[in-house]
Amino acid sequence: MIERPSGIKIEKFSPTLGAIITGVDLSQKISDAQFNDINQAFLDYQVLFFKDQKEIPPELHIEFGKKFGELHSHPAAPTMEGYPEIFEIHAHKDSKIANGEFWHSDVSCDKEPPLGTMLQLHILPETGGDTMFSNMYAAYDELSNKYKEILDGLIAIHESEHIYKGRYSDRGVSEDKIETPTAKHPLIRTHPKTGKKAIYVNRTFTTGIEGMSKEESSSILNFLFNHCEHVNYQIRYRCLLYTSPSPRDS
C-alpha cells in the first residue's frame, strides 16, 4: 500500500488493473492535493475503487467529475432530474435490461467520448452485480509487432442506433428525444499524457473499419473483440454500498 502526503492510501487491486483508494471522503469537498493524487492513480491504474464512502450528493458528484474536465451528457439514457450530467440506472429482477451487460467502452459512438465514468451504487442485490473491466493497454502490448503494424492507422466506425433505439422506452424516454450518434476513431489510440497505446474497439458499438468491406473488417474486429475480452486482461469487482468505481476507458 502507498500512502500519499494528502492522506490518500492506494492499494493495487491486481497485477493487471485497478487500485483501491481509501483515506478520502468524496461526500465532502476534496483538496487540490487529494485530487492530484487521485488523478495520478487514475493514470497509473486506470480503474479506481473508492472504499468506505458515504452517499455523495449530486452537486459534489458533479463537482468532482468536473475536476477531470468538461462533463459528458449521455445521448439517450435517462438522467437525474435537475442534473443532466448524472445518468440514473434502475434495474430489478423483471427489468428487460440492466445496463452494460456486454463488453463496451462507454459511449464510444460519440465524436468525443468521455474520459471515464464515475459510478456510485445505492442499492445492491443480495448476490451478483459484479462489474468486470478489461485493460486495453495490456491487450495492445500482447499483440505481435507485425499485427500492431497492420492496425496502426486504421479507423474504426462506432455506431449506436442498434443499441439506443428503444432501449430506454420503459424508463419514460421518448424516441424523439434521444440521439444515436456515429463516430470514427483510430483503432489504436495513444494517451496524451502517458503516451501509452490502447486498442479502441468494442463489441457493443464498433461496427466496421473505414475503407474495408464488412467481411474484411469483421475478421479483424472479431479477433480483437475476443482478444480484448480474454481473462488475462480482466478484473472482477463486487461493489459495496456507496463504493465508487471510476473506470477509464482503457
What are these regions (language model features)?
Residues 2-241:
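Fe(II)/2-oxoglutarate oxygenase catalytic core
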